[in-house]
Amino acid sequence: MTLRDRIYLTWCYGKTQLVIGLVYNLVCASWLSMGISYSFFVDAFIIKTIIYAITLFLIYQFRNRDAIFFYINLGLSRRKMELSVLLLDFLSLAVLLTAVLIIYG
Amino acid sequence: MVRFGDKTVLSGGYITSETGKVTGLLGRNGAGKSCMFRALMGGLKVENVMVSIDEKPVNRQRIGLSVKYLPQGRMLPENMKLSRAFELYGVNYWSFVNRFPKYSRFHDAALWELSGGEARVAELGLVLLSEAPFYILDEPFSQIDPINIEAVQALIRERSRDHGIIVTDHNYDAISKVADNLFVIADGYTSPVHSRDDLVRHGYLR
């Protein structure tokens, strides 16, 4: 399986989490572009973790319980898929904030 | 052991599959058939689950590479094109169309565009035509019309020549036509079935 396939599957699996995460990431980036402080980063990541946990909880209440087997059949466990979504979400926040810092630095 | 609240659904599930054979699993509604499969495949957290092939334990984090599972409900992402799903599973879409010609027009269709029965056949083809030594099919005949049931039975027989397949379904006639050996699940335990009397004794038939 190629990296492109893996990213595509992560997107399919965690679309809702990633979209909500991206909206939050963009809000953070726009706040950061208006003023920078050290505590902002800590707060941004703490709030993100809380939002992530709440989203995950809500998604689990309504998720199709058989959908996971599409990924398990490909050798990807539930844990791997959750970690991939988490990684992609936090990575996009880190990349966005770094980009804003470089641009407005 | 599989437990929901105070209710123990499964306490001693055991099933084997041999290459070249189709194993049928029967059981009444709520007996724990799907729970057992979900537990085996890592879709349900349970205590003490063990899967082994040729007496070697299988890495359950990658079990899908050894055992492909067709769950009872829909598993394909609703917006994914059928051709993309087949590509990810390493299956040539046109080899599936050879068996089910109607699907030539669904090449670029997403799952939500198909009816329940059409989606079921597509998912079944996807699982059975992908490469793995073993397959577990949970109610493969549900929602499927009689003509397609025959085609599905033929596909199961064909794939069982060099693979091991476990099938469960409430369509007793359909399952008995493809199964080489049968198990019944009742009161939280699985038992082999040697005759119709065994099914009566376990409360599956009258």
Map each language-model feature to its residues:
Chain B
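Helix-to-loop junction immediately C-terminal to a conserved catalytic motif
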Residues: 41
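Q-loop/switch helix immediately C-terminal to the Walker
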Residues: 69, 73, 78-93
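Conserved ABC ATPase signature
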Residues: 110-114, 118
